[in-house]
Each structure stands twice: as structure tokens, then as C-alpha cells.
């Protein structure tokens, strides 16, 4: 695990975007695992800037998003499909057929989850996975005490997660209580992983994930076992970290 501590959010975003650009330049048909939320928005803006400077070509890239709220249609501004189109996909030359995001309105969730795993396998697995980390240590929507053997599945969202995500909605009551998420096993099979965190609110989770014991109660702690993880965090998120 390589840990990069930066001064601020902008620097974190630029470093992450540069790593994604390098991946796509070296392997134009890369399979990218993408995340949503506040943390990667700056990274996506930087990627768009790199693309506009003609240094990046998405025409052969395939993407798989980590998760989607259950019960939100894709036209809903709070859906992660809407988020990805607005923050990245509408601004680059990606083939829309190569975009994969769980369908939160699927009639049969079990079939949807198995099909998502099949698509990842058919694509050859994920070359580079972007992750954020929740205040409770979750990655994707894999909440504390999730099985490390989990694949794409329907999740009951933790109260902390609902509380944290309520800032995106008019009220806490509007936040969906379930989501479809790639599982820990799905994530850990990625060839390379970049974990992003910014701000003091994430410092506990970052410390426990990196310095603590590998424990299902802190889902991100499983990343200690992965052979190629880069952690990019600002000074506030790193404030409780014991660096060797």
C-alpha cells in the first residue's frame, strides 16, 4: 500500500486524475471502476480537462460503477446514473454502450446483481478501481460487518450512511434505505485500487482502515491485503494516521 498525503482537495483530485489518465493512455481499452459522492467530483473535473486537451481518449474504455440507490430511476437527479452522466460521461467521448451502472429499478435484483458480475468478468475484470471511504469505513455501499466474500448485492444502508447522504436530499426521509453495490470480493479483485479521502471527518475511518486490524466492521481494512493500492488523502484525513 502506497500512501500519498497532499495539502488539499485540489491536489488530491489532480493526482487521482493523472493516474487514471496514465492508465487509459497505457491501455486504451482499460476497464475502470468508478465511484460517486463528493470526493471524486474534483477528480472528474480534472479528467475532463485532460480530455479537452486531447491527452485522453475514452472511445474504448469500459466503466463499472460501484453502486446505485435502489428505487431511484435514472432520471432522478440523486441517482448515481444521473451523477455520472452529469459529472463525466456527457463530457467525454465514451461509448454509452460501455457504461455500466447497476439498475436501481430492476424487477429482479438477484438477476441484476449476477448479471453485473458476469459483465465485469466478461470485460476481463477491473483494471483500476476508484474508491471513497465512508465515515464508518464503508467502501461502495458495503456497510460494517459485510462478508469479505460478498459480490454485487442489495444492501440495507447503515444509519450513519443515510445521515451522511441526507445532505444531497431535501430531507433525511428522502434518502433511499437500500442500494445495489459491488461486493468486497468484486472490489478486491481489481488489478489496481486508488482510495481517496479528504477532510477531518474521514480521519477515523482512514486510520482504522490502514492502521487497524483487518476487520469486517471496517470494510476498507481489507485493502491492506491488496497488492496494489494507492491511498491519496489530504492532511486532515491523514491526521490520525500512523505513518511508518
Swiss-Prot record:
Upper classification of the organism: Bacteria, Bacillati, Bacillota, Clostridia, Eubacteriales
One example GO MF annotation: identical protein binding
Organism: Clostridium botulinum (strain Langeland / NCTC 10281 / Type F)
Listed SUPFAM superfamilies: NagB/RpiA/CoA transferase-like (SSF100950)
One Pfam family it belongs to: Glucosamine_iso
Protein role: Catalyzes the reversible isomerization-deamination of glucosamine 6-phosphate (GlcN6P) to form fructose 6-phosphate (Fru6P) and ammonium ion.
Pathway the protein takes part in: Amino-sugar metabolism; N-acetylneuraminate degradation; D-fructose 6-phosphate from N-acetylneuraminate: step 5/5
Enzyme Commission identifier(s): 3.5.99.6
GO CC terms, sorted: cytoplasm
Keyword terms, alphabetized: Carbohydrate metabolism, Hydrolase
Presence of keyword Secreted: no
Domain of life: Bacteria
TM stretches of this protein: none
Alphabetical list of CDD domains matching this protein: GlcN6P_deaminase
Presence of the UniProt keyword Transferase in the record: no
EC supergroup of this enzyme: hydrolase
Listed name of the protein: Glucosamine-6-phosphate deaminase
Catalytic activity: alpha-D-glucosamine 6-phosphate + H2O = beta-D-fructose 6-phosphate + NH4(+)
Active site (catalytic residues): 67 (proton acceptor), 136 (for ring-opening step), 138 (proton acceptor), 143 (for ring-opening step)
